Amino acid sequence: MLEHFRAGWAKVMNPIADALLRAHVTPDVVTWIGTIGAVLMALICFPQGWLWQGPWLVTLFIFSDSLDGNMARKLGRHSQWGSFLDSTLDRFGDAAIFTGVALYFAGPGNSVLWTAMACAALVFGMATSYVRAKAESLALEAKVGIATRADRLLVSLVAIEITGLARVGAFPHWCVVALPIALCYLTLAGAITVVQRMVAVRRACES
């Protein structure tokens, strides 16, 4: 869903990318800073129950996912290393978000069920990325699916924010169910996406 908005978002990031390049900041540095920042914010904020603050801080660093590629294009660099680094570090950022949520439910959230569901959402999210990466290593394409990385990030961070605001009284208390509902959706959507991509690869292999 959100993949269709990447081109427009890249234009928004252009001025920031230009400013960083003028400051002699490299795309790789932006990638590392973004990943380390997102991981730290997710693993510090979410386990502590800082659910309405955490998503804003994580999102701030996730912006680098658009910036590094934008900067590389402006420099005329389309290196395999840059693509590999970006894709690899993205997995750490994604894992940190769901690990942070699992730790929240294992601590302040006090729910074994939702701790397990957060772990399941993490596993299926990683599986969707692995299936695509493996397919591409075989010169095949597996970008299909109802839950891309951008979709997973949006759903998870918005749900965490809503639950956090409900916990502090900014939203009606029943809105605390937003995060559990999102975990159910992400687990199911992740499983479906894995199947969709496996089917796509199977068909490509047989064609």
Curated annotation (Swiss-Prot):
EC number: 2.7.8.-
Residue sites binding a CDP-1,2-diacyl-sn-glycerol per the record: D28, V29, V30, T31, G69, R73, S79
Main location as per UniProt: membrane
Enzyme class, UniProt record, top EC level: transferase
Transmembrane segments: 21-44, 50-67, 88-106, 112-131, 152-170, 176-195
Bound cofactor: record note: Contains a di-nuclear catalytic Mg(2+) center.
GO cellular component, one term: plasma membrane
Catalytic activity: a CDP-1,2-diacyl-sn-glycerol + 1D-myo-inositol 3-phosphate = a 1,2-diacyl-sn-glycero-3-phospho-(1D-myo-inositol-3-phosphate) + CMP + H(+); 1,2-di-(9Z-octadecenoyl)-sn-glycero-3-cytidine-5'-diphosphate + 1D-myo-inositol 3-phosphate = 1,2-di-(9Z-octadecenoyl)-sn-glycero-3-phospho-(1D-myo-inositol-3-phosphate) + CMP + H(+)
InterPro entries linked: CDP-OH_P_trans (IPR000462), CDP-OH_PTrfase_TM_dom (IPR043130), CDP_ALCOHOL_P_TRANSF_CS (IPR048254), PIP_synthase_PgsA1 (IPR044268)
PROSITE patterns named among the record's database cross-references: CDP_ALCOHOL_P_TRANSF
Entry similarity comment: Belongs to the CDP-alcohol phosphatidyltransferase class-I family.
Function of the molecule: Catalyzes the conjugation of the 1'-hydroxyl group of D-myo-inositol-3-phosphate (also named L-myo-inositol-1-phosphate) with a lipid tail of cytidine diphosphate diacylglycerol (CDP-DAG), forming phosphatidylinositol phosphate (PIP) and CMP. PIP is a precursor of phosphatidylinositol (PI) which is an essential lipid required for cell wall formation.
Subunit structure: Homodimer.
Family matches, as HAMAP family: PIP_synthase (MF_02241)
Name assigned to this protein: Phosphatidylinositol phosphate synthase
Source organism (scientific name): Cutibacterium acnes (strain DSM 16379 / KPA171202)
Highest classification ranks of the organism: Bacteria, Bacillati, Actinomycetota, Actinomycetes, Propionibacteriales
